[in-house]
Amino acid sequence: MARLHLVVVAMAALFAAAAVAQGPSASPTPAPKAQPPVATPPTRPPAVAPVSPPAAQPPVTTPPPVSAPAPVPAPSAAATPSPQASAPTAEPPVLSPPAPAPGSISQSPTEAPTSPPPPSAASGVSPSAAAVVAAWAAVAAVAAFY
């Protein structure tokens, strides 16, 4: 008779642990219905403070016109190209990442990590599943001793 009582208590603990692990969404009571909003009386808008006139701004002066530069004659097709004409256009230099110091292990930020991240402590096992397994283990242990 005592063995049956212990098994019943262990089964009750199993169901309680499963209900706690599943959270409040698994409760047998229905969710409360939303109440319709209560109509509130209209309120008066707040008083508007008088607006001061904008401060006077100084007049904008334009700089005097600058005389146009003298036109540069276009080079003829038969003329040899001058050193200025053959100079390449200025391009911004391409910056490369600094070289790592000798003996150091470095990884550029654009490269992907070479090894996968370590698994987390609870990877693949939900808390509710862990609680159910622990409760079943407790039931099995109690039943084995009696």
From Swiss-Prot:
It comes from the Eukaryota. A lipid is attached at S120 (GPI-anchor amidated serine). Residues 1-42 form the signal peptide. Residues 75-89 have a biased composition (Low complexity). Residues 121-146 form a propeptide. O-glycosylated on hydroxyprolines; noncontiguous hydroxylproline residues are glycosylated with arabinogalactan. GO terms for cellular component: aleurone grain membrane; side of membrane; vacuole. This is Arabinogalactan protein 1. It comes from Oryza sativa subsp. japonica (Rice).
